[in-house]
């Protein structure tokens, strides 16, 4: 099982594409939203991700929090402005 973890804040313009790029790869997609004031969470949920809301402290804490929700044997971190390519 593969868990894809995405840390995000105010990324409504890119989060949907990031999630779509891993939909066929991931068994679960978890987005940690660090307090967005835009529609990042709603877009992520509609794209199929589980959204965890948490006030942003720092990048490392957000990643560690995301890992506590993951159930996969493998964890893949993807930044919200990145895309997994088909060759991945």
Predicted regions mapped to residue ranges:
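A conserved acidic beta->alpha catalytic loop
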Residues: 21, 33-42, 79
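Receiver (REC) domain switch/active-site residues of two-component response regulators
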Residues: 27, 49
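N-proximal low-complexity "stem/linker" segments adjacent to membrane-targeting elements
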Residues: 1-24
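Short aromatic/hydrophobic "clamp" motif used to bind/position activated sugar donors
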Residues: 75
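Acidic helix N-cap motif at the loop->helix transition within catalytic regions
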Residues: 16, 38-47, 87
């Amino acid at each position: 099982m593969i868990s894809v973890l995405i840390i995000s804040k105010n990324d409504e313009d890119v989060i949907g594409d990031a999630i779509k790029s891993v939909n066929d790869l991931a068994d679960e997609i978890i987005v940690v939203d660090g307090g967005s004031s835009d529609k990042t969470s709603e877009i992520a949920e509609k794209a199929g991700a589980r959204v965890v809301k948490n006030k942003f402290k720092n990048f490392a804490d957000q990643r560690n929090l995301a890992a506590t929700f993951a159930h996969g044997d493998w964890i893949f971190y993807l930044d919200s402005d990145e895309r997994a390519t088909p060759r991945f």
